[in-house]
Amino acid sequence: MPTKHKALVIVLLIVAASFAVAAEDGPEEVIRGLYKAHQPREHRELNLRNHAVLSKYFSPELTKLFLRNVQVERDCPKGDLCGLEFDPILGSQDFDDHLAFKLHITEATWPQTGRFEARFKLFNEEKPEQEQVLVFQLVQVKNGWRIDDIIYTKDNASLKAVITAIVKEAADLKK
C-alpha cells in the first residue's frame, strides 16, 4: 500500500475512533465538550443554526426548538428583535472579553439522574456568589447523552420554555 494511502487510512481510523468515543461520552463530558466548542470570548461559537452541530450536544426535542428559533429569526421583520436575545449556553448577553473561564460541574444527587449543575464566572472580578449557575438536564438517546434542557437559576427560566414562548409568540403574530 502506498504511503499516501496508509496515511489516509490512519487519519480515517483516528476520525472514526474520535466519533466512537464522543458517542460514549458520559453526561458531564457532553457539557464539558459543549463549553470547549463554544467559547465566544475566544471568537469560537457553536453554530446554533446547524442541525448536525446541535444534535451533537442537544436532544432531538431541543434541537428542533433551536431550529424553530432560527426560523423565527429568519422570518423576523427587518429592524425587529426576534428569537433568542442572549447566549443560551452562557445564559447571558454579556461576558468579559478576556475571561479566565473555569467551569465547575457537579452532578445532582439521586433521584435526579441526568441533572448537572455548571458554575462559572462571566466576569473575572465576580465573587463566587455571583457566579453563573446553570442546571443541565440530560437524557440518554441512541447516540449517547444529550442536553434536553438548561435551567437558568438566576431567572428561574428554562431554555425549552423560553424558545417555546418565542415560537408561540411568533405564530400568534402571524394570525
Language-model-detected regions and their locations in the chain:
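Bacterial N-terminal signal peptides that target proteins for export
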Residues: 1-9
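N-terminal signal peptide c-region/cleavage motif recognized by signal peptidases
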Residues: 15-20
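Short, aromatic-enriched amphipathic alpha-helices that serve as compact interaction elements
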Residues: 25-43
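Non-catalytic interaction/Regulatory regions outside core domains
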Residues: 35, 51, 55-63
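Surface-exposed patches in mature extracellular/periplasmic domains of secreted proteins
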Residues: 42-50, 54
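Surface-exposed, charged secondary-structure patches
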Residues: 59-128
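Low-complexity, intrinsically disordered terminal/linker segments enriched in charged
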Residues: 112-133, 141, 148-175
